[in-house]
């Protein structure tokens, strides 16, 4: 069994791979972590991001809604990522519905939500 620190390092590697364009390897690591810890939200959100970066917004939405938010509806990180997904997919109404409540808070999530809303509202 892997320790929490080892799992965290694996997710760091997967996230770096995903952001570097190596989506296939990133997904393999996410799958490995999920095999050890089914339903583990950080791995599921990484997996969703691996779909967002290749414009597979429908699968990212499915993962976030059906696997993360179904288990933890108040997870603000997952909701923020869903808002990003909707923004990039140009689904303005859905993005605003998700991001508006998040933008009223404080901290990095609120700043990201506010920035995404500003971007949405500047587009025709």
Give each language-model segment a name.
Residues 4-29:
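Alpha-helical segment of the N-proximal tetratricopeptide repeat
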């Amino acid at each position: 069994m892997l320790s929490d620190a080892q799992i965290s390092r694996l997710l760091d590697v997967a996230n770096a791979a995903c952001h570097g364009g190596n989506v296939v390897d990133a997904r393999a690591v996410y799958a490995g972590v999920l095999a050890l810890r089914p339903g583990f939200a950080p791995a599921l959100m990484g997996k969703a991001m691996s779909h967002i970066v290749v414009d597979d917004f429908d699968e990212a939405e499915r993962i976030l809604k059906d696997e993360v938010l179904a288990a933890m509806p108040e997870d603000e990180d997952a909701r923020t990522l869903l808002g990003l997904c909707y923004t990039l997919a140009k689904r303005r109404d859905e993005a605003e519905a998700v991001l508006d409540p998040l933008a009223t808070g404080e901290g990095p999530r609120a700043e990201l939500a506010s920035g995404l809303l500003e971007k949405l509202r500047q587009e025709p």
